[in-house]
Regions:
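Generic low-polarity alpha-helical segments
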Residues: 1-3, 38, 86, 137-140
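Conserved AMP-binding/adenylate-forming core of the ANL superfamily
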Residues: 35-88, 105-110, 114
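N-lobe entry segment of adenylate-forming
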Residues: 1-47, 51-61, 126
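Generic, low-specificity signal for short hydrophobic/alpha-helical stretches with a mild N-terminal bias
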Residues: 8-9, 34, 72, 91-95
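Structural core segment of the AMP-binding/adenylate-forming
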Residues: 65, 88, 92-145
């Protein structure tokens, strides 16, 4: 007898839920378990799922006051735990995250922001300067990052 595969029902079809929140699924691990190894600073920083979940909740509360489900939110941050938390927080409130890259020039940012319908961008001072009025910047330090 063949062994059942995770995610498949008895007939071999995928078990697809009617609703799925990617953020909740991603964060549904032991809070003490390692989620992210941050090597961007002077020293290694380990971020647990519990800490990441707290970061996500803080950002989600701030974003929920500004963005509706289905809204497009740009993320223009460096590669850090806060960048990961930003995407998860956006998904948690049912919005769509649009990854943006600080090495893009203005025209590349403009095409992505406009094509995706981004109106708000979670960023920092460097990112705000790169945006140049393309969308409303939401400064990370104003939401506890």
């Amino acid at each position: 007898m063949a062994q059942a595969l995770p995610g498949l029902d008895r007939s071999g079809a995928w078990e697809i839920p009617t609703r799925l929140n990617m953020a909740a699924q991603c964060l549904s691990h032991d809070p003490a378990r390692l989620a992210i190894i941050d090597l961007t600073g002077d020293a290694r920083r380990d971020v647990s799922f519990g800490t990441l979940s707290d970061m996500v909740d803080r950002l989600a509360r701030a974003l929920a006051q500004r963005v509706r489900a289905g809204g497009r939110v740009g993320v223009l941050l460096g590669q850090s735990p806060w960048c990961a938390a930003a995407h998860l927080a956006i998904w948690k409130i049912g919005a769509i995250s649009v990854p943006l890259f600080k090495l893009f020039k203005y025209d590349a940012l403009a095409s992505r922001v406009r094509d995706a319908g981004v109106t708000l961008v979670l960023t920092d001072p460097e990112g705000r300067d790169l945006l140049g009025g393309l969308a409303t910047p939401l400064m990370g330090d104003s939401v506890g990052m």
